[in-house]
Design a protein with these regions (language model features):
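Universal eukaryotic N-terminal targeting presequences
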Residues: 1, 25-28
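Positively charged n-region of N-terminal signal peptides that target proteins for export
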Residues: 1-8
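C-terminal motif of bacterial Sec signal peptides marking the signal peptidase cleavage site
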Residues: 16-19
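Bacterial signal peptide processing site
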Residues: 21-23
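A residue-level marker of the well-folded mature domains of exported/periplasmic proteins
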Residues: 27-29, 34-376
């Protein structure tokens, strides 16, 4: 766990916020990584060993895209390979496939993508390019529709409920009694985060005998930062909500704006967001860069074909693989300690602490001590 947290911190400190411009369908940025991982602008046609195709965001989003790209860069830097990233010109399957085509034309041995929106594109591209290895983070087998992952595809999902549980438990143990969960869309990863958060908060409340813990729970219906979300969060904070777990990419920007305006706090998601938002007390994180590096290393060591560890299957990573957690070194807890965290983490790893991983939006987690207000 300490290795994972150190990795997250190092990656966070190393990332720059240089934007990638360009609006052509073949936009690509190259990183020659024999000795450095500094990106330099390039046109499609440059040599590519490993490609990263972004989702609707960019590589400076301080979230999923940025840390996934960091994983690609780290891997290529360590192995004297060339990395390119490709940004679709619009949010469509056709645009995503077009950038995959560009990556293959540039010589990519492997293409990395992140997010469930890539399901249809992966389902088509894996058959179109059987010699290219596709690594898809946060894409489940179900996201591929009626297609199954082929031997050249590795799907990685995460046990978000474990990270959410740790965040909920720590917040309540630390003394917060009025909590909120702001989800983007009610997709499996977001639901698991939220349900884990509820379970953790309930467990802590029961342990410390707090019968007055409340959670407001709401899905905004999208991942964009909007005035609607900010207004909703303004209402929560002004009504007494102390901290909100904001789970849904850019939607956290609206939550942070409301938190700042009302003196509230926020829990970040996916990556350590303490450097991005002063309101963040902790973050429920995934080991994005680390899992990218491990999967690509697996393919490279097997002649650029995934081994049976990843090939044609969905691999779920959690505490046992050091791929979810809280960045305790940057967390702003006053009561919840590193020792408590380590003990709880070990209990999750060895199975002593079991956390419900269901993600049915219509079936809420059972609670014994807290009150949850599910809002629509």
């Amino acid at each position: 766990m300490k290795k994972f947290l150190a990795f997250v911190m190092a990656a966070s400190m190393a990332l720059s916020l240089a934007a990638c411009g360009g609006s052509s369908a073949s936009t690509a940025t190259s990183t020659t990584t024999a000795a450095t991982s500094e990106a330099a602008a390039s046109t499609s046609g440059s040599k590519t060993d490993v490609a990263f195709v972004t989702d609707v965001g960019n590589i400076d989003d301080q979230s999923f895209n940025q840390y996934t790209w960091q994983g690609v860069q780290d891997f290529c830097s360590a192995n004297s390979l060339n990395a390119n990233y490709y940004r679709p010109t619009e949010d469509s399957d056709a645009a995503r496939l077009e950038q995959m085509d560009n990556a293959v034309n540039d010589g990519a041995k492997s293409i990395v993508v992140a997010g469930y929106l890539f399901g249809n594109a992966i389902a088509e591209a894996q058959e179109k390019y059987p010699d290219v290895q596709f690594l898809a983070l946060d894409v489940s087998a179900g996201d591929l529709g009626d297609k199954a992952p082929t031997a050249n595809t590795a799907l990685i999902t995460y046990k978000e409920e474990q990270a959410g549980y740790l965040a909920g438990y720590a917040a309540v143990y630390d003394g917060y009694k009025e909590l909120g969960f702001l989800g983007g869309m009610a997709v499996p990863a977001v639901i698991r985060y939220g349900y884990g958060f509820v379970q953790g908060a309930d467990a802590a409340a029961k342990e410390i005998g707090a019968t007055d813990v409340n959670i407001k729970y709401w899905y905004s219906g999208g991942f964009a930062a909007t005035d609607e979300v900010k207004n909703k969060m303004d209402g929560w904070y002004s009504e007494g909500t102390e901290v909100v777990f904001a789970c849904g990419g850019p939607v956290c920007q609206s939550c942070d704006a409301a938190a700042q305006a009302n003196g509230g706090k926020m829990i970040g998601v996916d990556v350590d967001q303490s450097g991005q938002f002063d309101t963040v007390i902790t973050s429920a994180t995934k080991g994005l860069a680390e899992s990218v590096n491990e999967a690509l290393t697996d393919a490279m060591n097997n002649g650029w074909k995934f081994s049976e560890t990843y090939s044609g299957k969905e691999t779920k990573l959690g505490a046992a693989e050091n791929c979810v957690g809280l960045p305790m070194s940057t967390s702003k807890f006053t009561k919840f300690t590193q020792e408590q965290y380590d003990s709880m983490y070990a209990s999750i790893v060895d199975g002593t602490l079991a956390i419900d991983d269901s993600y049915d939006a219509d079936v809420k987690p059972a609670v014994t001590t807290i009150t949850v207000d599910y809002q629509s």
